[in-house]
């Protein structure tokens, strides 16, 4: 049976939502620790509720009054902020009444319809840019309801198949803080794709879609290295860290003189070294590398074709990736989280960029340079004792050139229901693109255009005008010389 783990802070948040608004709802951000266990990372109340209804204490809001469009919008926006190891795993409802935790009530039946509506909206929204993951799409979700009247919690597993069904699942509020291990890598883009659209005006969004498909294909065929070495997929992250620790311990010499150096002291001395190398996890970072295969290995020789194309799409840049894993995650899951984070970040940048386009069509004769937003990171503020140990969990947002961190503050409040300090936002993880690179591209394009004109059989307009003026000047000079010669001969 599937189990959901929550912290005491989550219980206090549910109680707070019911006390302040009498009826609140929102999303659940979680992490898949293993096949049967999920960890709740964050609960975020939906802030797009009707303000007029909130002011009316006589109005009794129910699950049927929930705006599925607003909740789906929050779901999608939060998914863009989550690292690759986290997902929106469900929704929660917090109320002062007890019928929200009664399986026989009408509220429980309305919850099933709400999930069905939201899932349909999510599928429709994702159809244009594909899924956010390199794995299969998620179909099981969590429904969590809290009643302030009797301090009771109801937790169910919702499966979209077979018309949508609720099944039992366990939940526990744990006192022990959750432990997180941070992994970080940089993914370098430098690839050229052909534009096969033969029309004069090309849809740039369609070309971005082709780019996403290509990157996803490369990520699926890639290999992930941890600390510059290949690690077996079958072991878990905790065993990998222990193995690295044991390996370093064996390198420490054991002194037999003086009676002060022992195996225990060697283990203690090795911990700072492990921490400095980013091996033991905790507050340190494990460095990862995504290695792509050779292009010739991605396709068979029979798949190679010679085709005409109308232009090229050049991808250039670096994506900074940060994921946060549970010690019991398998290495296979860790690698998948890193790949998902890169793909999710790329899709999010493209979506944010395309949302700001006034005209998605460009001519295939022009040099079109796109600068998607860069990624910035922020930590969730905690009230009271921290609900986690080890690495501090971070979410991300995207800023265009010239935008201030205050944009992130507003987005975090609206989507994740957290109050951020602009000074705590990490904006240096990804730098701004170098303008000289764009200028060089433009100069190269100009040179290509000039060379095309030089090969023409027609003379340049500037050269024709010069020859015309020289001809007139020579004619005037000959005319003046003739007149002068005529006067000289006439005087004689």
UniProtKB/Swiss-Prot annotation:
<comment type="function">
    <text>May play a role in the trafficking of a subset of G-protein coupled receptors.</text>
</comment>
<feature type="compositionally biased region" description="Low complexity">
    <location>
        <begin position="254"/>
        <end position="268"/>
    </location>
</feature>
<dbReference type="Pfam" id="PF14778">
    <property type="entry name" value="ODR4-like"/>
</dbReference>
<keyword id="KW-0812">Transmembrane</keyword>
<dbReference type="GO" id="GO:0016020">
    <property type="term" value="C:membrane"/>
</dbReference>
<feature type="transmembrane region" description="Helical">
    <location>
        <begin position="469"/>
        <end position="489"/>
    </location>
</feature>
<keyword id="KW-1133">Transmembrane helix</keyword>
<dbReference type="GO" id="GO:0012505">
    <property type="term" value="C:endomembrane system"/>
</dbReference>
<dbReference type="InterPro" id="IPR029454">
    <property type="entry name" value="ODR-4-like"/>
</dbReference>
<comment type="similarity">
    <text>Belongs to the ODR-4 family.</text>
</comment>
<protein>
    <recommendedName>
        <fullName>Protein odr-4 homolog</fullName>
    </recommendedName>
</protein>
<dbReference type="GO" id="GO:0008104">
    <property type="term" value="P:protein localization"/>
</dbReference>
<keyword id="KW-0472">Membrane</keyword>
<feature type="region of interest" description="Disordered">
    <location>
        <begin position="251"/>
        <end position="270"/>
    </location>
</feature>
């Amino acid at each position: 049976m599937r189990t959901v783990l929550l912290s005491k802070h989550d219980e206090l948040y549910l109680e707070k939502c019911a006390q302040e608004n009498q009826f609140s709802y929102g999303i659940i951000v979680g992490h898949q620790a293993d096949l049967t266990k999920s960890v709740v990372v964050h609960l975020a109340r939906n802030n797009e509720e009707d303000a007029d209804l909130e002011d009316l204490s006589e109005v009794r809001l129910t699950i049927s009054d929930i705006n599925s469009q607003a909740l789906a919008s929050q779901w999608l926006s939060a998914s863009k902020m989550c690292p690759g190891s986290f997902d929106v795993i469900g929704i929660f409802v917090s109320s002062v009444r007890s019928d929200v935790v009664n399986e026989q009530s009408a509220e429980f039946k309305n919850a099933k319809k709400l999930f069905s509506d939201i899932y349909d909206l999510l599928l429709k929204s994702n159809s244009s840019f594909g899924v956010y993951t390199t794995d299969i799409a998620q179909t099981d979700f969590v429904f969590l309801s809290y009643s302030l009247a009797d301090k009771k919690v109801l937790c169910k597993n919702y499966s979209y198949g077979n018309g949508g069904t609720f099944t039992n699942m366990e939940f526990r509020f744990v006192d022990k803080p959750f432990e997180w291990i941070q992994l970080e890598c940089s993914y370098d883009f430098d690839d050229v794709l052909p534009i096969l659209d033969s029309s004069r005006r090309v849809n740039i969004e369609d070309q971005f879609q082709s780019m996403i498909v290509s990157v996803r294909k490369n990520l699926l065929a890639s290999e992930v290295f941890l600390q510059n070495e290949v690690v077996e997929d079958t072991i878990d992250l905790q065993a990998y860290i222990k193995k690295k620790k044991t390996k370093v311990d064996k390198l420490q010499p054991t002194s037999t003189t003086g009676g002060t150096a022992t195996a225990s002291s060697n283990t203690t001395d090795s911990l700072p070294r492990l921490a400095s190398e980013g091996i033991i996890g905790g507050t340190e970072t494990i460095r990862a590398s995504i290695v792509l295969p050779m292009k010739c290995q991605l396709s068979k020789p029979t798949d190679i074709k010679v085709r005409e194309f109308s232009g090229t799409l050049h991808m250039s840049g670096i994506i900074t990736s940060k994921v946060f894993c549970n010690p019991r995650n398998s290495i296979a899951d860790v690698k998948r989280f890193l790949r998902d984070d890169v793909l999710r970040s790329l899709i999010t940048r493209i979506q944010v960029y395309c949302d700001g386009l006034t005209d998605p069509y460009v001519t295939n004769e022009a040099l079109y340079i796109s600068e998607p937003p860069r990624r910035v990171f922020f930590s969730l503020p905690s009230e009271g004792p921290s609900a986690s140990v080890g690495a501090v969990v971070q979410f991300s947002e995207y800023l265009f050139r010239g935008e201030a961190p205050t944009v992130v503050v507003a987005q975090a409040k609206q989507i994740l229901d957290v109050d951020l300090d602009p000074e705590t936002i990490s904006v240096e993880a990804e730098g701004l693109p170098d303008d000289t690179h764009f200028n060089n591209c433009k100069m190269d394009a100009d040179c290509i255009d000039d060379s095309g004109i030089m090969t023409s059989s027609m003379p340049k307009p500037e050269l024709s005008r010069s020859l015309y003026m020289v001809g007139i000047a020579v004619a005037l000079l000959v005319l003046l010389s003739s007149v002068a010669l005529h006067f000289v001969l006439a005087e004689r």
